Each structure stands twice: as structure tokens, then as C-alpha cells.
Amino acid sequence: MFARLTSTLFALAAVSAVFAAPGATTEQCNGGEVQCCNSVQDANNLDSSVKKIITGLLHLDLKQITGQVGVTCTSVNVLGIGGGSSWYGFAFSYSYILASDWAIGVCSTQQKVCCTNNSFHGLIALGCTPINVSV
């Protein structure tokens, strides 16, 4: 019984430490949402595969798209929870939280951007502005 109580208290303390982590980010952007995108491309210089997605799947006019386009993006909101990842894993495995960049809103190999049109289920995001992360 004592061991179970100790384990439970340790797990709660560990989870609390993650939520209080100094690296945690609650970045927001004016009129948009912070995203982690696998790539960010200029609307005037899109890859042919991205053009096909925009015109073929999404039925958008390329001439109407300006600025930066995020490709394959996931949302990063408070501590990253509720984004494109399945956040329920943290309830079952503390180590999963520590190993997951999205748990603290970090884009490890992706570009962090602020995008104003994210209504394409992560396929693309429009109106993106890169967010520079200083270390």
C-alpha cells in the first residue's frame, strides 16, 4: 500500500514538473495559431506536389495564395496538448511525455510558424510567418 502511494505521488510530482517546465511555451500569434510544419514554402515557388495538393485535393486557386505555405503541419497550443498528436498518451506513460517534443510545444526538426488559415487538417497551412526561436 505504501509503495503504491509513493509511486502515485512521484508520478503526480513528475507530471507537475512537466507542466511547470521552463521550456514550456504558450506562444500565440495575432489572428493565427502556432504550428510545427515539416516544410515552409513561398507561395510563388511551391513544389509541384504541393501545387497538386492545393489545386487537386483542396480546389484552391494558386493565384489567390500569397506569402508562406506550411506543409504537413500540427498545432502547438498550451504545452502542445491537443494538437495534431494524440495527447492521451501522457495519462498512461510519464516517459512518453518526456520523450515527446509536442508535450512542451517544441518543434524539434520542424519549422515553427504562425499561420492564419489552418482549416486543411494539417495538410497545408496558409498565411504562415516563421517564428524564430532563440536559445
From Swiss-Prot:
It is found in: Secreted; Secreted, Cell wall. Keywords: Cell wall, Disulfide bond, Glycoprotein, Secreted, Signal. Coiled coil: none annotated. GO terms for molecular function: structural constituent of cell wall. Aerial growth, conidiation, and dispersal of filamentous fungi in the environment rely upon a capability of their secreting small amphipathic proteins called hydrophobins (HPBs) with low sequence identity. Class I can self-assemble into an outermost layer of rodlet bundles on aerial cell surfaces, conferring cellular hydrophobicity that supports fungal growth, development and dispersal; whereas Class II form highly ordered films at water-air interfaces through intermolecular interactions but contribute nothing to the rodlet structure. Belongs to the fungal hydrophobin family. Self-assembles to form functional amyloid fibrils called rodlets. Self-assembly into fibrillar rodlets occurs spontaneously at hydrophobic:hydrophilic interfaces and the rodlets further associate laterally to form amphipathic monolayers. This is Class I hydrophobin 2. It comes from Coprinopsis cinerea (strain Okayama-7 / 130 / ATCC MYA-4618 / FGSC 9003) (Inky cap fungus). The gene is hyd2.
